[in-house]
Regions:
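C-terminal catalytic/acceptor-binding lobe
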Residues: 3-20, 24, 28-29, 36-39, ...
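Residue-level recognition of beta-strand->loop/alpha-helix junctions
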Residues: 77-79, 130, 258
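Short beta-strand-to-loop acidic/aromatic patch adjacent to the donor-nucleotide binding site
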Residues: 99-110
């Protein structure tokens, strides 16, 4: 399911919930007209059985914000019970579009719409916002709570992320370089997939796939998103970390926006900001 919003759309200064969308954040003053290349965003989510209401609300607020900044956006949802296949099909749809950037958003993630502008403005090949896993380290939570004064329920989150140098994390304007990170809120430029297609021609998928109740061949269908198992080490890598590895192996770089609040919804709403977790960030 796909629908587009172009820069000619008209919106009110208030969003659909009647709240003023101007939060005073500097990124809201970003003049996209000064960019050399026109941004066209492809917002996509692999789904299975439904989406979280908080995800829907954040998506609608993002739509309003992008319209104000005259950034065209295509929204694309695909139903797949296999997350790797879902991500590959989303990527295929992006490559068939004329969009310049693809934004992966998992359907259990709630985000601040301004963080998307922050990632676009960073102008990186790949930039993501890390979100907490659905688990709490209570020993860590206790220590951070005692040191920071924050409530224990807001501490002790675990963020699945690997740094280039864990002992020397350099952060500028909330953006820092990483080795691996989650794909549930990840912005990727088109040129990333174009380069990966050149470097990994063996990943081309040629078989037919069920789409819209029909078996058909899919254009630009690549197995960029797949899990990885190291037989020698006996270690498993999820499709997002494995994707990051593919990109860095051919010289690419990955960045994270660590200064944005994001919520991972489940039985409990895990809301956090990586920079608050007592990490060494300078």
């Amino acid at each position: 399911m796909t629908y587009k919003i172009d820069e000619r759309s008209i919106i009110n200064e208030k969003n659909i919930f009647g709240q003023n969308t101007n939060k005073g954040n500097d990124v809201l003053d970003w003049d996209t007209k000064k960019d050399e290349k026109k941004i066209k965003l492809f917002f996509t989510s692999p789904c299975h059985g439904g989406v979280d209401i908080h995800y829907v609300r954040a998506t609608l607020e993002l739509q309003a914000l992008l319209q104000r900044h005259k950034i065209p956006v295509t929204f694309h949802l695909i139903n797949s019970s296999i997350v790797t296949q879902g991500r590959n099909l989303c990527t295929s749809a992006f490559l068939k579009s004329e969009c310049t950037h693809m934004l992966f958003v998992d359907t259990d993630v709630e985000f601040d719409e301004t963080s998307v502008l922050t990632m676009l403005k960073a102008d990186k090949d790949i930039v993501l916002t890390p979100y907490p896993m659905k688990v709490i380290d209570w020993d860590k939570a206790k220590n951070i709570s005692q040191q920071s004064g924050r409530h224990i329920s807001k501490c002790g989150y675990y963020y699945p992320m690997a740094f280039v140098d864990p002992e020397n994390i350099d952060c500028k304007d909330g953006i820092t370089e990483i080795k691996r990170g989650p794909a549930g809120f990840m912005l990727i430029k088109r040129q990333v997939f174009e380069k990966m297609a050149e470097e990994y021609p063996h990943l081309k998928i040629k078989q037919q796939t069920m789409l819209n109740q029909q078996m058909r061949e899919t254009e630009n269908f690549w197995n960029f998103w797949d899990t990885e198992f190291d037989q020698e080490k006996g270690t498993f890598m999820g499709e997002d970390f494995a994707f990051c590895k593919k990109w860095t192996t051919i010289g690419g770089k990955i960045y994270a926006n660590v200064d944005a609040y994001i919520t991972h919804h489940g039985d409990y709403s895990y809301k956090g900001r990586f920079i608050d977790e007592g990490q060494k960030i300078k």
